[in-house]
Amino acid sequence: PVAYSSNGDGFLEHDKTCFTGKLETELTLENFPSPEDLWERYKKYKGISTKEQENIAAFEYYFDTTGRKPRYYQQIAINRAVEAIAKEQNRILLVMATGTGKTYTAFQIIYRLWKSSTKKRVLFLADRNALLDQTKRGDFRHFKDKMTIIKKKRIDKAFEIYLALYQGLTNYNEDKDAYREFSPDFFDLVIVDECH
């Protein structure tokens, strides 16, 4: 919400938070706000008011040794989703085009919420085995032994990250549906991939 431009002599601050009471202000280098000041403005602008909300919103992305990091539009989606969850919004829909890294975006959201201890048990649902296997070997591989794929309706509640097919949790006999082995509040976060 804050941007700066310079002509080499001074700075012009464009502040959508209107923290100083003005949208645009001329600044000298000596008056340039500190990172802490900018963080306070950001929190005010986004409505982040509690320490818990701040801890969730401030948690870093996952960076692996390959140097892969979220693209700018993924960062926007991740940040908005995490901030909405921090503000206790229960339902979020991300609409992203084919090939834009929806699964990687989901991984980053899960990672930030999981590592910040906000959401400890996560269910990731997909529509086909190939997508689950690819997800486990690919973007989600960093969860290692904390993750499992629910197969053949066998459930081990010792894990924190669960991958499953929609149809893998249901049966023709409703009394034997695998999802019934979980209490309604077992999962802190449910992500449905390819929700169409």
Which residue stretches match the model-derived regions?
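ATP-dependent helicase/translocase motor core
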Residues: 1-121, 126, 130-145, 157-161, ...
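Short acidic low-complexity segments
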Residues: 148-156
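Walker B catalytic acidic pair
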Residues: 193-194
